[in-house]
A protein has these predicted regions:
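Sec-dependent signal peptide recognition
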Residues: 2-10
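Repetitive helical segments and hydrophobic/amphipathic motifs
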Residues: 11-12, 127
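C-terminal motif of bacterial Sec signal peptides marking the signal peptidase cleavage site
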Residues: 16-19
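Bacterial signal peptide processing site
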Residues: 21-24
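Ser/Thr-rich, Pro/Gly/Ala-heavy low-complexity intrinsically disordered linkers and tails
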Residues: 26-38
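GH16 jelly-roll
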Residues: 35-176
Length: 176
């Protein structure tokens, strides 16, 4: 079974204590720099160069929600490319979902191996900067996922989690 690299250099999987959490700002942003979208000498290496803007190898999530407890929806307006960087934003919605954020994910399936991302984690309660692999019902597979998450309330720690057949709750917090 292949994993979808949800190269979701995701500025929000808002999950602080069962919800999106409060913030003094109604809008927060995340700059992410990376090499990308070129293949290197290895046939298994993919890099993304955001100086070229969005790549055809990736998609911007839009029009769906990640549901409870996150209460967030994805919008293409929350993913922009400027000065060689991708910027993901989160803002208040005011409708059925409390927040709207940005997600950028690969279109390709990748197997097991080494994954690497260069990102600047946002420091803000209720926000998570993350990188994860995912496969699930949207790919006609069981829900399997590996998460690497920097929680905005304390960016000196990274949280790891995994799901197998939809069962999670394997969180491990690591001090950086």
């Amino acid at each position: 079974m292949k994993k979808v690299l949800a190269m979701s250099i995701l500025t929000m999987i808002v999950m602080s204590m069962g919800g999106c959490g409060a913030s003094s700002d109604s809008s927060s942003s995340q700059d992410v720099s990376s090499k990308a979208e070129t293949e290197s000498n290895s046939p298994y290496t993919v890099e993304a160069d955001f100086s070229k803007g969005a790549s055809n190898d990736f998609s911007i999530s839009a029009g769906w929600s990640n549901g409870d407890p996150f209460n967030c929806s994805w919008s293409e307006d929350n993913v922009t490319f400027n000065d060689g960087k991708m910027q993901l934003t989160i803002d208040s919605m005011g409708d059925s979902e409390a927040y709207r954020g940005g997600e950028y994910r690969s279109k390709e399936n990748y197997g097991y191996g080494l994954y690497e991302v260069s990102m600047k984690a946002i420091k803000n309660d209720g926000v998570v900067s993350s990188f994860f692999t995912y496969t699930g019902p949207s790919e006609d597979n069981p829900w399997d996922e590996i998460d690497v998450e920097v929680l905005g309330k304390d960016t000196t720690k990274v949280q790891f989690n995994y799901y197998t057949n939809g069962v999670g709750k394997h969180e491990y917090m690591y001090d950086l």
